[in-house]
Regions:
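Solvent-exposed, non-transmembrane amphipathic alpha-helical segments
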Residues: 40, 44-47, 83-99, 191-194, ...
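Polyanionic, low-complexity intrinsically disordered segments
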Residues: 3-36, 151-227
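Short runs of predominantly hydrophobic/aromatic residues within well-ordered alpha helices
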Residues: 53-60, 64, 68, 72, ...
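Helix-loop junctions and short alpha-helical segments
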Residues: 59-60, 67, 71-162
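Generic hydrophobic-segment detector
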Residues: 46, 50-53, 107, 140, ...
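Charged alpha-helical initiation segments
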Residues: 1-58, 72-75, 81-82, 86-91
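Intrinsic-disorder-associated interaction segments
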Residues: 9, 13, 20-23, 65, ...
């Protein structure tokens, strides 16, 4: 956990959240640079300024991806370490064991699961799954959270005027936008539509809400302590 000063005391936050906030500060700075160059005047900005909005979208999604990876890794690793028997993490254990058995292991290999050896298998599977995460969209977050956190986080993403279904749709739309920016970027003859400032602002708001919902569900929300 990390501590941050607040007006009436100290706020205790996870390091994962602090890292996310720092990354999103960079996103906000890119938007400020864009606004400073355009003076927020109506009309389409100069093409050379579009890079600021494209970079902001890429950084925002990268911050979200890192948050997902670190949250799943830290929460699952802690649960595995604290477990005294496989039944303490039965859902995760059964999932990994089933995959292992599908490989038709030889009898001598069963010895690797004895003692605390099973914990190593779970941790290795965790790292492989996180390494394979190439898109932090709702489907992948759903799969990871059900396997390693014990529930589908996407069903808990809701806030004022936003349902879980709407939240997942917006996230997936943002991920697709990031993909378009990464794979196409600035193309000749403007074959791809420019990113609107509004899209960057909405992305920042969406990801902040998703982080808040995720940490609240896992009992990791910031704690304010009066001093």
């Amino acid at each position: 956990m990390s501590r941050k000063a607040v007006s009436a005391g100290v706020s205790i936050e996870t390091v994962t959240r602090v890292n996310f906030v720092c990354s999103m500060d960079d996103v906000a700075e890119l938007l400020r640079q864009h606004d400073a160059c355009t003076d927020r005047k109506p009309g389409r900005p100069l093409p050379r300024l579009e890079v600021l909005k494209r970079a902001a979208v890429i950084l925002a999604v990268t911050a979200w991806e890192s948050f997902v990876e670190d949250t799943v890794r830290n929460y699952a690793s802690s649960a595995i370490e604290k477990a005294s028997r496989p039944s303490d993490v039965h859902s995760l254990f059964n999932s990994v064991a089933q995959r292992w058995l599908e490989g038709k292991p030889k009898p001598p290999e069963l010895a690797d699961w004895t003692g605390n050896g099973w914990k190593g298998f779970l941790k290795n599977k965790l790292e492989k799954d996180l390494l394979a995460l190439n898109s932090p969209n709702s489907e992948n977050v759903r799969t990871l959270s059900k396997r390693y956190l014990g529930e589908d986080l996407t069903t808990r993403w809701h806030w004022e005027r936003t349902t879980p279904m709407l939240a997942t749709r917006r996230l997936d739309a943002l991920i697709r936008l990031r993909g378009e920016v990464v794979h196409h970027g600035r193309e000749a003859f403007n074959r791809t539509a420019a990113i609107q400032r509004k899209q960057v602002v909405e992305a920042i708001s969406l990801l902040n809400h998703l982080v808040e919902c995720t940490e609240r569900v896992l009992g990791l929300a910031p704690i304010d302590i009066d001093t």
